[in-house]
Curated annotation (Swiss-Prot):
This is Outer membrane lipoprotein BBA14. A lipid is attached at residue 20 (N-palmitoyl cysteine). It is a lipid-anchor. Is a highly immunogenic protein recognized by sera from Lyme disease patients. Transmembrane segments: none annotated. The keyword Membrane applies. Residues 1-19 form the signal peptide. It is found in: Cell outer membrane. The keyword Endoplasmic reticulum does not apply. One of its GO terms (cellular component) is cell outer membrane. Keywords: Cell outer membrane, Lipoprotein, Membrane, Palmitate, Plasmid, Signal. InterPro entries: Borrelia_plasmid_OrfD (IPR004248). It comes from Borreliella burgdorferi (strain ATCC 35210 / DSM 4680 / CIP 102532 / B31) (Borrelia burgdorferi). Outer membrane lipoprotein that could act as a component of a potential toxin-antitoxin system in B.burgdorferi which could serve as a plasmid stabilization mechanism in a growing bacterial population.
Amino acid sequence: MQIKNFPFLFLLNSLIIFSCSTIASLPEEPSSPQESTLKALSLYEAHLSSYIMYLQTFLVKTKQKVNNKNYPEFTLFDTSKLKKDQTLKSIKTNIAALKNHIDKIKPIAMQIYKKYSKNIP
């Protein structure tokens, strides 16, 4: 059996292999809303939650991939600390808790990204 598109398939396989050997990039932290309405703050809270989940997933997956015993310690966000009701006060409390956790893990994620983004085998 002869493969007619061998160069193309070789190039495609090489591209897939090399593209999978890098770690994900880090997105920008969501910016604060212009207005302090319930809707705007709720959306901001959701964006911060997504951002934390991304950072945590990045850290966990990178830790597994690099398998380095000197990998920095980090804690996962405890969602049980979030208020369940949708009042302005509760949402502002949740935003403060989310931003506090981001302030703790973002520097670790940035450090890991800078260290390993080009050095993944």
